[in-house]
A protein has these predicted regions:
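Phosphate/dinucleotide-binding and metal-coordinating scaffold of catalytic cores
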Residues: 1-263
């Protein structure tokens, strides 16, 4: 078992990360991400909170998948979500610090990422292009991420949907996970419409770096100072996107006219 001190640090970092992502969604308002009213996509049925959902994974060699899991390498798999099968999706282990902690603890029940269109362009689950499965490592309540997302939604932050799922692999039970709508194309289209703007997921290269951009701080006009944001853009960057982002952070830093960049 990991020391309680490190467990506390990991939990704190998870909550901080959730609110940094919330801050990123706010800053993205200046890039054209304004919430819109739109018909609900069919895949939202998988995120209903009236029951624990079911997700079955079929992969040719599960042991081989676990062996390369630390490399976060995609393998081909078939998945069935509440009886709806999608064949030939991309499956990999997910996580950064959380994945390494799983390995250090000697476990193999990794968080998972399912990219429906990884091998076949346009493939989806009822319109959903990417799904994360949170193993809730070191969270026996399974509630920290779920509650953080619920708080974000309550505060009016555009928030990924989430639900609890029982996962099985090749017919064998693999445990309870939290399924989370990945903030990519389907997420952006659901909340911001077909003409959505840019979406970022700030992430540092090294924890020892200053990482001021991850904290959404304005550090000058040089786009290179915002590598941890621009590098993680979920869509292809267009001309002017970097300048728009920097302008939003400049305004947030000044504390004036914040309503111009925060929806």
């Amino acid at each position: 078992m990991l020391a309680r001190r490190w467990s506390t640090v990991v939990c704190a970092l998870a909550l901080v990360a959730a609110f940094l992502v919330a801050g990123a969604f706010y800053a993205a308002g200046a890039a054209g991400l304004i919430a819109v009213e739109k018909d609900e996509p069919a895949y939202l049925s998988f995120f209903s909170d009236d029951r624990v959902h079911e997700l079955e994974i079929s992969v040719e060699d599960w042991d081989a998948f676990l062996a390369v899991a630390p490399e976060e390498r995609y393998v081909r798999a078939d998945v069935t979500l509440d009886g709806h099968t999608v064949r030939g999706v991309g499956l990999r282990a997910k996580g950064n610090n959380s994945r390494r902690l799983v390995e250090q603890a000697g476990h193999v029940r990794y968080g998972l990422k399912i990219e429906f269109d990884h091998y076949e362009e346009g493939l989806s689950y009822l319109g959903l292009d990417k799904l994360s499965l949170d193993a809730s490592f070191q969270d026996n309540s399974y509630l920290k991420t779920y509650v953080a997302l619920d708080m974000m939604a309550f505060m009016g932050v555009p928030t990924p949907e989430a639900s609890f799922v029982q996962v099985s692999v090749n017919g064998q039970a693999w445990g309870l996970y939290l399924a989370v709508e990945d903030p990519e194309d389907a997420f952006a289209e659901r909340l911001f419409g077909d003409g959505h703007g840019m979406l970022y997921k700030p992430d540092y290269r090294r924890l020892s770096d200053e990482n001021a951009d991850v904290a959404l701080r304005y550090v000058g006009e040089d786009p290179a100072r915002y590598d941890n944001i621009l590098r993680t853009a979920r869509f292809d960057l267009a001309a002017g996107d970097a300048e728009e982002l920097i302008g939003a952070l400049r305004t947030l830093s000044s504390g004036e006219n914040i309503d111009e960049v925060v929806d």
